[in-house]
Design a protein with these regions (language model features):
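Short internal beta-strands
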Residues: 130-135
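Acidic/polar active-site rim loop that often engages polyanionic ligands
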Residues: 58-60, 124-128
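Short glycine-enriched loop/turn motifs at secondary-structure junctions
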Residues: 14-15, 127-129
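Histidine-anchored nucleotide/phosphate-binding helix
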Residues: 114-124
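Short, glycine-rich nucleotide/cofactor-binding loops
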Residues: 104-114
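A conserved regulatory-domain signal marking ACT and ACT-like small-molecule sensing domains
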Residues: 2-102
Length: 135
């Protein structure tokens, strides 16, 4: 059983990461990703995945906590588990720290309703990105 002090220490020492993956769909991908995250003591806090029958691609987005702040270590563990599982298809895999704010260019049509919504969310902190330009 974990006491409150240990739980608090573990919480402070963890880093939140976001993992995204796109690869040709085949059985065992989610299992390999989960095993790779377990190898780095990762704890999945949020997960969304789907297979797209039209493109035959598997897409996954996972938010996780790990004791390491090195995103490349997390990515390497997942890549290794995919290889161990026999997944040799090309994999587009990205792991970044959750607090890293990506730069996003917003491109809009002449109708501004979507732009207004995006800027509202950004200004209120609901959309954690940096917006250098709107075109």
């Amino acid at each position: 059983m974990i006491d409150a002090k240990t739980a608090q220490t573990q919480e402070v020492m963890s880093t939140s990461h976001i993992l995204t993956l796109i690869t040709p769909d085949e059985p065992g991908i989610a299992h390999a990703v989960s095993a790779g995250l377990l190898d780095v003591d990762g704890n999945i806090t949020e997960n969304a995945q789907f297979g797209d029958p039209g493109s035959e691609l598997f897409c996954l987005r996972t938010v996780l906590e790990t004791p390491t702040d090195d995103s490349e270590t997390v990515a390497d563990a997942v890549r290794q588990r995919l290889l161990d599982a026999g997944h040799t298809s090309p994999v587009k895999l990205r792991v970044r720290q959750a607090d890293a704010r990506p730069r996003v260019l917003i491109m809009v049509s002449k109708f501004d309703h979507c732009l207004v919504d995006l800027l509202y969310r950004w200004r209120n902190g609901l959309l954690p990105v940096d917006i250098p330009a709107v075109v």
